[in-house]
Amino acid sequence: VAGLQAATQPTMQDYTQYVNPFVGTGGHGHVFLGANVPFGHIQAGPTQKKQGWDWCSGYHYSDSVLVGFGQMHLSGTGIGDLGDIALLPVTKNNEREVKFSHKAEYATPGYYAVTLANGVRVELTATPRTAFHRYTFPADAKQEQVVLDLSQGIGWDKMTACSMKQEGQNTVVGTRFSTGWAKDQRVFFVAEFSQPITHQVM
């Protein structure tokens, strides 16, 4: 009986190997590129400059400049909103946008990675309510900084109020209120870093 049962068990297959997350990120697709789980609150992914309707998801394949990695994105809606709590790893002061090449990008369901032109390797994954970011700075980087931008949004999203404060050595807590397609959106966040925060500029 045991042998018969084993013979009738279906073999598990990894169907995610057939998924191409880049489909729909060009043209008028408005597809979000990044890391999320089904029905999750978090969609961690790259965010580009606002350049019109085709950038509604925060990302368009024709573009090669990033302004951050936001925690919330819409996908396939044609609605320009979200992009909240953008983080950007930089290697020099006043760096607020970074170029990248699609050859340096990799995406699979639940995971996104890119090596930026400044040499920083960015990796993203997510749970239903948490985004995980890993930044690997180049060995010769003179500075290792992370810009946390609360003003950045997607499409017609506009910040109406925000707050941010450091708690302990590694944690930043804050709020971001905005208006856009969602007329009164309120986001509350906690950002915990693996290294102590040694300096901050508000």
Residues covered by each model-derived region:
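Boundary at the C-terminal end of the N-terminal hydrophobic targeting segment
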Residues: 4-8
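Accessory carbohydrate-recognition regions in carbohydrate-active enzymes
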Residues: 9-202
